[in-house]
Amino acid sequence: MAQTLTHAVHMIAHGRVQGVGFRFFVRDQASRYSIKGWVLNRPDGSVEIHAEGPKDQLDEFIAVVEEGPRFGRVSDLEVDWVEPTNDYTGFSIEF
């Protein structure tokens, strides 16, 4: 049986992404795509995301995050592929 490789991505979402349920949306989508990691509001009004999982799932997750929730608007999504840490057992909202 082939082993599924874990990949990781670090993202910064800009736009109308705070006060619109964006972190909860990201957490729910992470669960949908079996992604592990975290999401965090940043003081500058952006949202930071670290996500780990299979590359195909991450690609789909990134596309959904870029689309954003109904009342939010992502004007720019910075995406950097990074080394996975494999430290996560789920996906959390950080404060």
Model-identified regions with their sequence ranges:
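Intrinsically disordered, low-complexity, mixed-charge
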Residues: 1-95
